A protein has these predicted regions:
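C-terminal membrane-cytosol helix-exit motif in multi-pass small-molecule transporters
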Residues: 169-170, 192-219, 428-432
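Pair of pore-lining "gating" transmembrane helices in MFS-fold secondary transporters
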Residues: 18-48, 122, 254-271, 354
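Helix-loop-helix hairpin linking two adjacent transmembrane segments in secondary transporters
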Residues: 144, 153-204
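Hydrophobic core of transmembrane alpha-helices in multi-pass small-molecule transporters
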Residues: 33, 114-129, 348-362
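C-terminal ends and interior cores of transmembrane alpha-helices
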Residues: 96-111, 330-343
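Intracellular juxtamembrane helix-capping segments at the cytosolic ends
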Residues: 46, 129-143, 362-375
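Helix-to-loop junctions at the C-terminal end of transmembrane segments
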Residues: 74-86, 173, 307-320, 406
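C-terminal transmembrane helical hairpin of 12-TM major facilitator-type secondary transporters
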Residues: 321-367
Length: 445
């Protein structure tokens, strides 16, 4: 099927202002606001809780690695569930699993059980995977020319909860202490409640299911009869020159495009998780309070999501490949700033982490739009889940490796290395653009 035919068969043929797309985005926005708090709560104190229970910082990156390892497995499962049963079933299952993981972290902290803690961290990662998978649901019914903005609208909704979460660390810690729970486990109480609420919202309100509706529309468009041309139209057409051939991507080009989209998101996630994970530890070692680290992480998470509308507009306006290059440059700048500012400078670290969040936003939105456009509906959710599996594994590697890099070298080395690593997307862009396209007569499918 050509890109033109696929576009015609997809929701682009629907009315310009699609009420079902508008409803879908509104429901997703509500769920993302809730789940954002769960997403950010564990990020801020996960490493600190593990360091406190293990009495060493050498494994401080392990919680992020376990979050993302669990996220990797959940991404695949949520993608498969969505492919078969729709987004509603897949996303709801993922959020409820994340809520169970949050409860497990709290129990492990109370019992001082490190093994249970690590298992719970992995289960908690399902919420992270689901939060990211929701962006695909926002694009299911969107027209191809507005997919970047649809993705970014869902992502930006996460900001409210994601920024509030880290800043509630102190409040939730005091609340937990009053209940006899270790203060560092307090944010996971918030995370569990937030994930559970998001799951309930999606199960109750995400009707009709956007992916199932998109498939139904595509099938109806494919079966719709073509109106016969009149005799006058036939005669007029016969006197015209044949239409120009349509240049469509070969299977190789489609595979390379999927590879490029995946690489953009893999590098973006790996670099972001590595630097973000060790920043609270770096700040604590230089005398900053936990609340101060929470502020820096709040800036970072805010910049991950608040610029999403800009990232979406840039992607729709200039194309995902150019925005991916901008993402790599921004991540490099983030690494340089984070490495070179004095450890005592809260403002400097906030700027570095803010740039890190912006680079992540540019990379994720551009990669998502590129992937969604290149994959047909019949295998879209499964392919998206597989790509998100690779993205989560990259985050796991970044989180796990970050602790060892800082322990054996320095935070500055980690930040610089991450910034340089982001530039690896450039040769992949060159490689993806080399595959030939096949030419077919206009109007063929």
């Amino acid at each position: 099927m050509t890109d033109q035919a696929r576009t015609a068969a997809e929701p682009a043929a629907a009315p310009r202002v699609d009420p079902q797309q508008r409803r879908t985005v509104l429901v997703l926005v509500l769920a993302q606001v809730l789940s954002g708090a769960g997403l950010a709560a564990g990020i801020t104190v996960g490493a600190l809780l593990a360091a406190d229970m293990l009495a060493t910082t050498a494994y401080a990156g392990l919680p992020a690695a376990l979050f993302t390892a669990g996220s990797a497995a959940a991404a695949l499962v949520v993608g498969r569930l969505s492919q078969r049963w729709g987004r509603r079933a897949g996303l709801t299952s993922g959020y409820l699993t994340g809520a169970v993981g949050a409860a497990g972290v709290v129990v492990a902290a109370v019992l001082d059980d490190v093994v249970l803690l690590f298992v719970a961290f992995a289960v908690y990662g399902a919420g992270t995977a689901t939060n990211l998978q929701a962006r695909y649901a926002g694009a299911d019914l969107a027209s191809p020319r507005h997919r970047g903005r649809a993705v970014s609208t869902v992502l930006v909704a996460t900001t409210v909860g994601a920024v509030a979460g880290p800043n509630l660390v102190g409040v939730m810690g005091d609340l937990a202490a009053g209940w006899g729970i270790p203060p560092l486990a307090g944010p996971f109480l918030l995370g569990g409640a937030a994930y559970a609420a998001a799951g309930v919202v999606l199960w109750v309100l995400l009707r009709p299911d956007p992916l199932l509706l998109a498939r139904e529309r595509a099938e109806q468009a494919a079966l719709a009869p073509t109106a016969p041309a009149s005799a006058a139209q036939t005669t007029a057409t016969a006197t015209l020159a044949p239409p120009p051939p349509v240049v469509e991507p070969t299977d190789r080009q489609v595979r390379r495009t999927v590879l490029l989209a995946g690489t953009i998101m893999v590098l973006t996630q790996g670099v972001m998780v590595a630097i973000m994970t060790m920043t609270p530890i770096h700040m604590e070692h230089h005398g900053h309070a936990v609340a101060t680290a929470g502020f820096v992480i709040a800036v970072h998470v805010g910049m991950m999501y608040l610029p999403s509308p800009l990232s979406g507009w840039l992607t729709d306006r200039f194309g995902p490949v150019r925005v991916a290059v901008a993402a790599a440059a921004t991540l490099l700048a983030a690494g340089l700033v984070s490495a070179l500012v004095p450890p005592s400078s809260v403002v400097g670290l906030a700027v570095g982490l803010g740039l890190l969040g912006l680079g992540w936003s540019l990379g994720l939105v551009s990669g998502t739009a590129l992937l969604t456009t290149s994959v047909p509906l019949e295998v879209r959710a499964r392919t998206q889940g597989s790509v998100d599996l690779a993205v989560a594994l990259a985050g796991a590697a970044g989180g796990l490796g970050s602790g060892f890099v800082v322990a054996s070298s320095s935070y500055a080395a980690l930040a610089l290395g991450g910034g340089v690593l982001a530039l690896l997307v450039l040769p992949v862009i060159a490689f993806a653009g080399r595959a030939p396209r096949r030419t077919s007569p206009a109007g063929t499918v």
